């Protein structure tokens, strides 16, 4: 589901689809952190709230600020960076925190 997901389509997902999406986000975050390092618990704990934000707000027009960035992995996955997520925190890869020059979704 995550591979072809566009951020704006989350608003049209059913409850069951959102549950499947959350499961997939947790799996991808877990697998990536086990390989690349990073913050696991804080990101797993923020999956449902991040999906809820995408189902209500209009990103990237609306902005979200993470207090320390340790909960942004699901946000990165949902905002068009799923294809590059396996490069998390690697040289030349995506950042482990929100970074304005990485995406219009980050502020």
Model region roles, listed by residue range:
Residues 26-29, 33, 38-45:
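Cofactor-pocket helix-loop regions in the catalytic cores of large enzyme subunits
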Residues 40-107:
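Cofactor-binding active-site loop characterized by glycine-rich and histidine/acidic residues
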């Amino acid at each position: 589901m995550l591979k072809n997901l566009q951020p704006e389509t989350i608003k049209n997902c059913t409850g069951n689809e959102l549950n499947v999406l959350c499961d997939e986000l947790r799996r991808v975050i877990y697998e990536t952190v086990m390989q690349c390092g990073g913050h696991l618990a804080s990101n797993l704990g923020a999956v449902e709230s991040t999906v809820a934000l995408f189902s209500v707000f209009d990103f990237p027009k609306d902005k979200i600020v993470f207090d320390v960035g340790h909960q942004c992995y699901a946000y990165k996955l949902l905002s068009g960076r799923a294809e590059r997520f396996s490069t998390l925190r690697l040289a030349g890869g995506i950042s482990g925190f929100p970074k304005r020059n990485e995406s219009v979704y980050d502020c």
